[in-house]
Amino acid sequence: MADETKPTRKGSPPIKVYCLPDERRAIEEKAAAAGMSLSAYLLAVGQGYKITGVVDYEHVRELARINGDLGRLGGLLKLWLTDDPRTARFGDATILALLAKIEEKQDELGKVMMGVVRPRAEP
């Protein structure tokens, strides 16, 4: 039998695409945002695959910070709800301010999450 080997991409002829420098730069930026090489990005797009980007680590860091803030605020609220003696000096105004701060952090968390899920939705 003849020795048949499967063709590889490196052994196949490339497809050349002519584009303007700003078009190339835009494609390179999208490939980098997806965490892919330019070749892999163009191959995936050309075959109709949906490209999913790499999660922005800055967003992840911000989410972790907000989560920590919510945990601390929730702990204070829990102390107050259990009638802990350390919270006896907390008045209604303090508790209402705490609840407002928790709601503010939840809104902030939602905005960051939308930035991760739909990064190109905002101008």
From Swiss-Prot:
Localization in the cell: Cytoplasm
Family annotation (InterPro entries): NikA-like
Cystine pairs: none
Main location: cytoplasm
Keywords: Conjugation, Cytoplasm, DNA-binding, Plasmid
GO MF: DNA binding
Record carries keyword Nucleotide-binding: no
GO cellular component: cytoplasm
NCBIfam families: PRK13877.1
Subunit structure: Monomer.
Functional description taken from the UniProt entry: Transfer of plasmid RP4 during bacterial conjugation requires the plasmid-encoded TraJ protein, which binds to a 19-base pair invert sequence repetition within the transfer origin. TraJ protein is bound to only one side of the DNA helix. This nucleoprotein structure is the initial complex in the pathway to assemble a functional relaxosome.
Name of the protein: Protein TraJ
Native organism taxonomy: Bacteria, Pseudomonadati, Pseudomonadota, Gammaproteobacteria, Enterobacterales
